[in-house]
Amino acid sequence: IRGLTQASANAQDGISCVQTAEGALNEVHDMLQRMNELAVKAANGTNQEEDRSYIQSEVDQLITEIDRVSTTTTFNEKMLLDGTFQNEELQVGAEGVAGNQIRISISSISSDTLGVKDLEVDGPDGSKAKTAISTIKNAIKTLNKQRSDLGAIQNRLEHTIKNLDNVVEN
């Protein structure tokens, strides 16, 4: 029974880890949404080149912040979003058989892997900004895929905990 109780606690740790990553991905999503808003603004023909340069400054700051989040998001001193959190095993059963482990992998989420590292919205016309809009949309799709994968893992862990708690109780 103690082994099963610990397995349940391990699964709960896994949920906490996933929630930490998800919280950071949520922030990155918000930054990408803001970048999209800025790109749409920069694409407007009423802007001057100087206006677009100011918009570019904010975009550059958002890119820097995405990378900061990528390199500083941790759980129990393990980096989560820099691409090194791969095939981490959670022991969710009392025995060491293969079916009692759940693996978690989190892709690198940085301005580079999202394709926005060199995003440009400045210039004399809105052409760079128009290109940036589709680049940002693709980045959001990539991010949403990772968020979906993490959500599925969290759901699986929640069901695992319910089952383990039921076994312990009975």
What do the predicted segments below correspond to?
Residues 1-170:
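Primary detection of the long, small/polar-rich alpha-helical "axial" segments characteristic
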